[in-house]
């Protein structure tokens, strides 16, 4: 028995000494006998360490002094001036898909959760893709328009269904002769159909906003048009918990004088109510999202200076509040809005201002970013991803970009 106890003690101390020895011989990278210096090795990071030989994941990034998780840019054509991005969505696998255009062809880009590109596809039969969704079968549906190169061509709306790798499963172009039609947004409804909104022009100068419903195989179920003046357009669309449809855009004349336009229909596209709001100068709505109270909040611009604008309506269409944020310089309007999980809303405007407001529309912070100005989403972990760089009023295009940030880090910095 004594010999056995002695043996156990010898083995214990041998193991203990070996463990200590191993610890002493490993460097910060975990390499036996190594001499790595751990730190941030990314030269663009704010805490880049020129002496570091091993990246330990501690890199921090700043954009205009604001902490961000990462910023990625993607160039598809030979000249980034010909690349556009309009919409970004999160995907079932944690990655992202961007819809846009490259060299006048519709474009989809798929990335992993870190923003690294996995694939991109361009679509010869389209000119631009304004919106994209991932649907229940794991594929993607995107919409926009197609216009041929001839002088006598007019744009037609375009609807595309792909598999999970962006390969075409079916595509549709539709419109009227010698008139302009395009689609700006698409959703998948609870009954697994597709609904799009945009512009339909079937009698010359009088353009109408439209809703069109398709099966998931691309078969048209119904088509409805809506107008309040001679020029009307649907820009963004949503379905509520009652399976009703709400779209926003503008109503005005072919020469301007646009007014905010919001229409609610039943699930078959039959109008329940429509609302128009006037402003001094042009005014229109680019985006809509649900409110916790069951209503809707829409974002766009107002007045001759194209100031940022928000309006909230209840489920019956009654106005709850609105605000035209007049600034010293034109901001060209909010282009996207998303509900925040901790209350209030996040927005992005044309000049790349990232804004957080409370439930009453009061601004909590307004931060100037760069590179992104069209589309914003909140992830399950509370991080924000912003994408888009297109040909809007305040810029002339630029590299397709995707940015991820943690709002809590902004809150801490602003305290």
What residue spans do the PLM features occupy?
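A sequence-level/structural motif corresponding to short, flexible coil/turn segments enriched
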Residues: 63-415
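Primarily marks secretory-pathway-exposed extracellular/lumenal segments that are disulfide-
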Residues: 4-71, 75, 397, 407-414
């Amino acid at each position: 028995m004594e010999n056995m106890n002695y043996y156990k003690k010898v083995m214990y101390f041998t193991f203990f000494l070996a463990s200590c020895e191993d610890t002493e011989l490993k460097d910060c990278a975990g390499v036996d006998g190594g001499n790595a210096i751990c730190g941030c090795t990314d030269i663009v990071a704010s805490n880049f360490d020129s002496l570091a030989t091993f990246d330990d994941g501690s890199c921090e990034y700043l954009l205009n002094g604001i902490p961000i998780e990462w910023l990625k840019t993607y160039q598809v054509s030979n000249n980034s001036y010909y690349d556009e991005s309009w919409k970004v969505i999160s995907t079932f696998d944690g990655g992202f898909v961007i819809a846009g255009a490259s060299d006048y062809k519709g474009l989809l880009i798929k990335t992993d959760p870190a923003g690294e590109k996995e694939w991109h596809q361009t679509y010869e039969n389209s000119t631009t893709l304004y919106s994209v969704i991932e649907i229940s079968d794991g594929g993607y549906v995107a919409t926009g328009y197609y216009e041929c190169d001839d002088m006598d061509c007019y744009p037609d709306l375009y609807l595309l269904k792909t598999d999970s790798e962006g390969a075409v499963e079916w595509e549709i172009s539709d419109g009227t002769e010698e008139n302009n039609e395009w689609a700006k947004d698409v959703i998948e409804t609870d009954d697994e159909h597709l609904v799009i909104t945009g512009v339909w022009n079937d009698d010359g100068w009088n353009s109408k906003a439209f809703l069109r419903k398709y099966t998931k195989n691309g078969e048209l179920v119904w088509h409805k048009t809506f107008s309040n003046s001679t020029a009307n357009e649907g820009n963004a669309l949503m379905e509520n918990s009652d399976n009703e449809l709400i779209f926003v855009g503008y109503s005005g004349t072919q020469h301007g004088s646009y007014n905010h336009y919001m229409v609610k229909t039943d699930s078959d596209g039959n109008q329940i109510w429509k609302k128009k709001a006037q402003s001094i100068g042009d005014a229109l709505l680019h985006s809509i999202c649900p409110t916790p109270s069951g209503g809707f909040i829409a974002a766009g611009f107002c007045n001759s200076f194209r100031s940022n604008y928000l309006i909230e309506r209840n489920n019956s269409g009654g106005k709850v509040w609105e605000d035209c944020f007049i600034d010293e310089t034109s901001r060209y309007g909010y282009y996207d809005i998303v509900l925040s999980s901790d209350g209030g809303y996040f927005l992005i405007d044309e000049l790349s201002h990232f804004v957080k407001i409370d439930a009453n529309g009061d601004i909590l912070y307004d931060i100037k970013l760069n590179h992104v100005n069209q589309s914003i989403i909140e992830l399950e972990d509370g991080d924000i991803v912003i994408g888009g760089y297109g040909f809007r009023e305040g810029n002339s295009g630029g590299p397709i970009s995707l940015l991820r940030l943690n709002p809590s880090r902004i809150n801490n910095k602003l305290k």
